[in-house]
Amino acid sequence: LVAQEVDGRHTLIHIEMEGIIDNLLYAERHTMRARMSNGVCLTCTRRAGNYFEATVQLRSSARRLSEKEFSELRLTLDKVIIEMPDDPMFFITKEGPVTGGYDVVLGSKALARAWGRHLISKHGGQVTATTSVVGRKDGADLTRLTLLYRKPGYALGDVIRWRGELWRPSSWSGEGAIVEKVEKRERTGATWRDLENANAVSYTHLTLPT
């Protein structure tokens, strides 16, 4: 195999092949022309053009989250990307703090939804999804997704005052939390609507922002 460069875009490739078939020696020579063309992959083009399909808005309810808490929430996205099958659209277009929270703009709606599910399972809270139509292609609507995630103002193990008594969230459920009464070890389920008026009175592992 010999490569002979003709110019910056064309190369002649000379190939010699030999083989023995039924004790007979065969030899062949071939020449082909290879042409190089510059191109950019679709994903690279989209990333360079600030393409995005979804925005995840990290917010809080009841109290203002600290920078550390927002950083911890943001780091969970890296874990989600690692655990999901490789997809060239799983990229971050831009991100940064905004008034009242932190926004992450993503190249994939599927990634945004997976992250939202992960946030709820690990940190509780609620996700509100809205979809907007931004155009049409091949007869189908092109849409963008906005996920608003609100983290509760307390974590598992914290003590909250709810319905005049002290409770401790022990686990998150799909629509709320399982809470345990501090005095009697009584357990019950509560939806986020039920917990709207709950106030945290003791934090286990938290330094509140000043």
Give a label for each model feature.
Residues L166-W172:
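Short beta-strand-centered aromatic/proline hotspots
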Residues P152-R163:
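Short coil-to-beta transition motif at edge beta-strands of beta-rich domains
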